[in-house]
Amino acid sequence: MNISGQTTFSEAQSKSLLKQFGVVFADETEVTADADSIDKAVKAAEQIGFPVVIKLCGESISHKTERGLVRLGIDNAATAAVAARDLLAKASSDDGRVSLLVAKMESGKRELIAGIMRDPQFGLFVMLGLGGILTEVIADVAFAPVPLSKTGALAMQNRLQQKKLFGEFRGESAVSSEQLANLLVALSRAAENDPSISSIDINPVLIREDGSIVAVDALVVKDSQRSGTSVTQRTKEMQSTNSNIRLFETLFNPRGVVVVGASTHPGKFGFVSLHNLISCGYQGQIFATHLELASVLGVKSVASIDDLPADEIDMAFVCTPASTNIAILEACSRKNIRSVYITSAGYGEAGEAGIQAQQFLMDKARELDILLLGPNGQGLVSTPANLCAQIVGPYPPKGRISVASQSGNFVSSFMNYARFTNVGIARAISAGNAACTGVPEVLDFFAADDATAVALVYIEGIQDGEKLAASMKSITKVKPLVVVKGGSTSSGALAAASHTGALASNDRVFDGVCFANGVTRVASAEEAFDVAATFATQPLPKGPNVVVLTTVGGWGVVTSDVISNDSVLNLIELPTDLSDAISALLPDRWSHNNPVDCAGGETRDTIPEVMRLIAIHPSVDSLIFLGLGIQSNQARLMTEGPFYPEHGLERIVSYHQRQDERFAQVAAELSIQTDKPILVATELGVADVKNPGVMAVQESGRLCYANGQRAARALALTYQYAKWCGIAK
C-alpha cells in the first residue's frame, strides 16, 4: 500500500525483509488468494502440524486482530478449511491483493513488542516494550537510538518497569536475554541498511515456556521520499560548530568587555549589567557606550563602538533596542570584538516580524564570524574570570559546575542553590532565543573547558536533535552531564498503522537518547543540583556497595528503603570482620547490620573511628553519614536559654560544636584518603545553615544533603554514570 509517499508492506513482505537480518519468526506458509486457496491452506496446516494460526494478509491490512482477521488454535483440517473460507470472505476491495498466512501456533504467557520508529528530531530508534493487545494501555517501553550495540540491547531490557517479567514466571523459564538482544540488534541493522524505513512493528514477540523467543507478526513501513541521511551536511555543521569553540574563550575569559547601551537609570539593563560587571570583581578592561557620553558608575562612556580602541575588547554585552543591533554587530567586527551577547527582546519570541529580524541577525553574525549569544537572554557568568555579565543576580561562589539553560530562570535557580550550599559554579549562561548558539554549542565548549568538572543543563525545545545528541555524546566521554528537560509533548502525527509510533513520545525518545549517551537525566532543579554537586565534589564510586552510618535510627531506615527500592546501589551485608571491628567500638545494642545504627553509644571518638573502619574496608564503595549537627543543635538551644554561659554550658556548647565540625572534616578527609564518596546528610542543611556541622561540610567544599534520600539518589546516579563510562564495576 502506498499513501503520500509511504509504502506499507504486507505481513508476509515484512517478515521476508526482516528474516534477512536474523529476526526469527514462527514457521509459516503464505497461500495466495485463488480458486484453490482453501485446499492449499489446509495442506499447509497439515505440513506445519496442528495446531496452527491462519490470518488474512494484505498490503493495506495492519491491525488484523481488531478486524477479526486472525483464527487461533486450529487443530484439524476441517476447522482450517472453515477458517480459510471465512477469512477470505472478510476481505474488502480496500485491502488490495490478499493472501492467507498459515503459521505454527506459538504460545507463551508473556508477550513483548519490538520495533523501529523515526523521531523527527533524533532520527531512528529501536523500541522494546510489553506487547499484546494492551500494548498502548500499559505503555511500558524503552527506546534506544540506531545503531544499537549488543551491550545496548541487553541494557534496554533492564529499563522496562515490569522487567521482572523477564525472570522465571509462573512455571516458565526466564527469557533468553541473548535472543532478545539479538532481535533488537537485527532490527537496528535493518534500519541502518535501508534509510527509507520509517517504522517496523513486531507485535507480539512471544516468550515461550523454555524462555526462547519467537516473533509472530510484523509490519514494515517505508517512506519513499526519504533519500537517506545527510551525513555530509551534518559533518559540515559539526565542523562549523567546532570552529566556534575557540571563540568561547573570548566570551568566558575576555580581555575586555563593553556594555553597549549603558544607562544611568538603576532600573535599566544597561545600568544593572555594568553594575554587576564592576561589583563582582571583573579585572579586565571595562568600557561603555552611551549616546550622551554619560559617566556610569565611574566608567566614562563613548558615543559608539567606533570610538573604542581596537583589539582590546573581546566581548560586547548589548542592551540596546533590536533595531540597532545589526549596526552594532558591524561595528564590533570593525573593532575585532569576537563575541556578542544580546539581551534585547523583539526577536523570535515576538511573531513573524521578530522571526525575520532574528534571521537577519543570525545571517550577519555568521557573515562576520562573530560568536552570537541570545538574543532575549539574561547573560552569563564566568567565575574563573570574576565575570558577571548579566541583567539579574545572583553571582555564585567559584566552583566546578557549569550551567547552560534555555531558561534564564533556571540559570538563576542553579546559582541560588550554589550560594545556599557553597558548592560553586564555573560558568553559567542563558541561551535566550539561541539564534546562532544554543545548548549543543555550549556543551562542546564545556567538554574542552578545564574549569568545568560537570555540566548542568536545562532544555525545553529542541531545534536539532541530532546535533544535541552528538554534543551530549561528546561531553559524557570526558565529564558528566546532568539534564533537566521541560515541555514534554507528543511527538506529533505518526503512522496510525504503527503500534511503535503510537507508543513514542518526545519524553520517551529523549530518555533513550540520554541513556544511550551516558547523560544523567533528572526530573527537578533540586535533584539536578544535588547530582551535579555530587559529581563536582565527590570521587566517582568504583562499585555499588554502600553503607549507611547513622546516629538517627529513623533516617537510616528511610534512606535504606530508598536504596533498596531504587535497585541501583547495593546495601551490603556487613562483612564479618567489619562487623566485629565495629562491635569493639559500640555497645552491644548497636544494629549489627547495615545501616550501622550506633544506638546512642557514641563516645568522643566513636563516629570518626567507625566511619574510618567502614571507609577503608575493601568491600565498601561508598558511605552515607546521617546525624550530623545534632549536638550543635542542642548547643544552640543552650546558648538561647537563660542559663548560658553558667553551669558549665559554655564548655559543653563548645564541645558539641567542635564534635560536629570534626565529623564533617573526618568525612571529607577519609573521602580524599580512600578515593571513595562519603556523603553527609542532615535536614539542618536546610533548617539551620549556620549549624557548625553544616558549615564545616560547606567549608570542606562539599554538599550537605538535605536528607538521606536525596543523598542516596544522587549517589545512585553518579554510580550509574561511573558504570556507563567504565570506571565502576
Predicted regions and their residues:
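Catalytic-core regions of core metabolic enzymes
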Residues: 1-729
